[in-house]
């Protein structure tokens, strides 16, 4: 089975969030099931580990300039395609924003070109490989199913479209329709029209043959008027083809026994080595040695991620002689609130603005618990990384967090199945109760260690999760 994986980012080449981890891990996991998945990625200027390539297709003009599809053969027998279009992707800054954090004004055209190339590959433009299925991710790839459905080519491969976060919708003005190579009659409710504008995510949801999102709970939430963010009605209409499939993680890449960024390696049989990592983290940030727990946050600092709940809980955390290390950036007001708290309480709170992959691993390996108080969370990977590294996740009861964590209530603790602490994010002080519970359990060493053990034993691998994708691909092919 041949599958084209269409994603605007994929680890290790380019990463801004969880989409990259998923898109980067799927091909290797699916290869174990004899699925030849090849990823198409824009050739951004900021690509890391750019592999050796050879051109396999040339465009004289693709959305305003010459472009080429490049092929790279990777270790492990995998193949990567890069869309090399310097006029669209050879720029300073990130994949979606300039060096000042502003969205590129032509993002719609940049990713329409990406989608056009994906559709061309799907229709057999490459000399020696044509996919049986196309798997497209998020709004940046939303026009792939649209271009294929609106084309006159036959046959065409079925398209699976995955929603990683419904909040990012790729909405652009109606007057860009022709510039995006969309026909006039596509601008309708049964097309790309979205409240008088063009919805690139909506296009993917409407035209794809099947839909997935990244957890069963989130699949239910986005069919409601509140969780659907303007697309709930469409998703209810498409409920028969909407599947909630949990994300996994690369258990080899995320392994505290071999992680090169971790000071002291450990596994579930040598948890005592985590104390070395905790002290290294405290030393790095000038925190006191303490008998209280060290909490960690690795997150975008936004309201969606519940960072305001963290700010509201800081006086309680400080009063309990607990500590907090934060890695992230985002909303300037929330970020400034955390920085101010760190300045006021430098021996208990530390904040690193931005993102640093090595530091994230050090926080996972040294923090006693990770705070993930999201208001909504499609799947979440942070809680999976936390469990893998022996940090107890404290999560809100939403989306994939609710699907992957077993709350440490009395019954679950007695049965030895608890993996974290869960709470309902329904009030401005709602994080205080789980923090209080976590601090109490932390001082009950036997229970806390069982939580760590159970989390580290949890199989969150793509090897396990990928079987659901293989079954869905097979079902899609059988319908053709």
Curated annotation (Swiss-Prot):
The UniProt record lists the keyword Transcription regulation: no
SUPFAM superfamilies: UDP-Glycosyltransferase/glycogen phosphorylase
One GO term (biological process): glycogen biosynthetic process
Alphabetical keyword list: Glycogen biosynthesis, Glycosyltransferase, Transferase
InterPro entries tied to this protein: GS/SS, Starch_synth_cat_dom
Pathway: Glycan biosynthesis; glycogen biosynthesis
MF-aspect GO terms: alpha-1,4-glucan glucosyltransferase (ADP-glucose donor) activity; alpha-1,4-glucan glucosyltransferase (UDP-glucose donor) activity
Binding site for ADP-alpha-D-glucose: 15
Function: Synthesizes alpha-1,4-glucan chains using ADP-glucose.
Family membership noted in the UniProt record: Belongs to the glycosyltransferase 1 family. Bacterial/plant glycogen synthase subfamily.
Protein name as annotated: Glycogen synthase
Organism in which the protein naturally occurs: Granulibacter bethesdensis (strain ATCC BAA-1260 / CGDNIH1)
Gene name for this UniProt entry: glgA
